[in-house]
Curated annotation (Swiss-Prot):
<dbReference type="Pfam" id="PF20259">
    <property type="entry name" value="tRNA_Me_trans_M"/>
</dbReference>
<feature type="disulfide bond" description="Alternate">
    <location>
        <begin position="108"/>
        <end position="204"/>
    </location>
</feature>
<keyword id="KW-0963">Cytoplasm</keyword>
<feature type="binding site">
    <location>
        <position position="132"/>
    </location>
    <ligand>
        <name>ATP</name>
    </ligand>
</feature>
<dbReference type="Pfam" id="PF20258">
    <property type="entry name" value="tRNA_Me_trans_C"/>
</dbReference>
<dbReference type="InterPro" id="IPR046884">
    <property type="entry name" value="MnmA-like_central"/>
</dbReference>
<dbReference type="InterPro" id="IPR046885">
    <property type="entry name" value="MnmA-like_C"/>
</dbReference>
<feature type="site" description="Interaction with tRNA">
    <location>
        <position position="133"/>
    </location>
</feature>
<keyword id="KW-1015">Disulfide bond</keyword>
<dbReference type="GO" id="GO:0002143">
    <property type="term" value="P:tRNA wobble position uridine thiolation"/>
</dbReference>
<dbReference type="InterPro" id="IPR014729">
    <property type="entry name" value="Rossmann-like_a/b/a_fold"/>
</dbReference>
<keyword id="KW-0820">tRNA-binding</keyword>
<keyword id="KW-0694">RNA-binding</keyword>
<protein>
    <recommendedName>
        <fullName>tRNA-specific 2-thiouridylase MnmA</fullName>
        <ecNumber>2.8.1.13</ecNumber>
    </recommendedName>
</protein>
<comment type="similarity">
    <text>Belongs to the MnmA/TRMU family.</text>
</comment>
<feature type="active site" description="Cysteine persulfide intermediate">
    <location>
        <position position="204"/>
    </location>
</feature>
<dbReference type="GO" id="GO:0005737">
    <property type="term" value="C:cytoplasm"/>
</dbReference>
Length: 365
């Protein structure tokens, strides 16, 4: 059994209704902690009640309450729909309209799940907030550090780079040293019916996978057609709205040409989609904004060799970073990388430790 090293205390567990957070609640309850389960209703969950493998659906709320009842712990469902729409859904829609590729799970962790839920946990008198994320919190010489989960296949550190130092001190991640199989075995040991429940796969507020319908519902008439232009300057055709395209996309362009073409750049101001050969996707350096830094302070223009991830599914790449201004950094790859997309996150690592990260801007070269 994993022990958090804490004395018996009051811990709020963010219970999504899945196996991970359910196992966390059971584990902490067995260790003698005063556990309070909280499940967030984040959107019109009626849309997804019948949808399998979607997070935060009505079934998930039911499952979380069922687990809490089995453990004999208090459980609350909090209506965060308005907070979620303002902080996550509206941001998601506006990001697409700006020609970006958004990352709503990071925005959700940053705002609703950590900022707002930590505030609620403190109001309930809780000493800590525990989640089912596969990351590790390690106490270093200068305070808490965020590290990758031991299981590379389940590591979620990329999605938690916006966690602040203050939040990290309050948070607990009991599953960071486990594999998914070990978590399921733990849930089975506790007799939890969700032990074999499938992982969520979809963006929770898009249960059918059709993000364009969500955008058009919130921002009607957002699919304005425009020009598709080759990076060499000549026009190739017409696009159906920039929300339908992302950097690196090859399929669905509707263009006949003598070589494969990829989306290289999206210009929301002029409503233009630029395409080119695969080589045009190569990137040497770019700028990130709204940097959240968790390590020792670095000076302006000081260069640091690190590893960076620009997509959750891509392996880390060696790069050199340098800070300028209050919240920006230049990231320069040691070897060129393909398809760096504005709106995605760039997360910075030193080995297993998350040093920080920021949002990729259009300043890409």
């Amino acid at each position: 059994m994993i022990n958090l090293g804490d004395k018996q205390s009051t811990i709020v567990v963010a219970m999504s209704g899945g196996v991970d957070s359910s196992a966390v609640a059971a584990m902490l309850h067995e260790q003698g902690h005063n556990v309070i389960g909280i499940t967030l209703q984040l959107y019109d969950h009626g849309m997804a009640v019948g949808k399998k493998n979607a997070c935060c659906a009505g079934q998930d709320i039911y499952d979380a309450k069922m687990v809490a009842n089995k453990l004999g712990i208090p459980h609350y469902v909090l209506d965060y729909e308005s907070k979620f729409k303002e902080s996550v859904i509206d941001n998601f829609v506006d990001s697409y309209l700006q020609g970006e590729t958004p990352l709503p799970c990071v925005q959700c962790n940053k705002s609703v799940k950590f900022r707002d839920l930590i505030k609620t946990a403190r109001e309930l008198g809780a000493d800590k907030l525990a989640t089912g994320h596969y990351v590790r919190k390690i106490n270093g010489d200068n305070g808490a550090e965020l590290h990758t989960g031991l299981d590379p296949a389940k590591d979620q550190s990329y999605f938690l780079f916006t966690t602040t130092k203050e939040q990290l001190e309050y948070l607990r991640f009991p599953l960071g040293g486990l594999t998914k199989d070990e978590t399921r075995k733990l849930a089975s040991k506790f007799g939890l019916e969700v032990a074999d429940k499938p992982d969520s796969q979809d963006i929770c507020f898009i249960p059918d996978g059709n993000y364009k319908s969500v955008i058009n519902k919130i921002r009607p008439n957002s699919s304005e057609s425009g020009k598709i232009i080759h990076v060499n300057g000549f026009e190739l055709g017409e696009h159906s709205g920039i929300i339908n395209y992302t950097i690196g996309q090859r399929r669905g362009l509707g263009i006949a040409y003598n070589e494969p073409l990829y989306v290289v750049k999206i210009d929301p101001k002029d409503n233009v989609v630029y395409v080119g050969p695969e080589s045009a996707l190569n990137v040497q350096e770019f700028i990130i904004r709204d940097v959240n830094w968790l390590a020792d302070e670095i000076k302006d223009n000081e260069k640091l060799e690190v590893a960076v991830k620009i997509r959750s599914t891509r392996p880390p790449r060696l790069a050199e970073i340098s800070k300028f201004g209050d919240d920006k950094m230049k990231v320069k790859f040691l070897c060129e990388e393909k398809a760096v997309a504005p709106g995605q996150a760039c997360v910075i690592y030193a080995g297993a430790r998350v040093l920080g990260g920021g949002w990729i801007t259009r300043e890409i070269r």
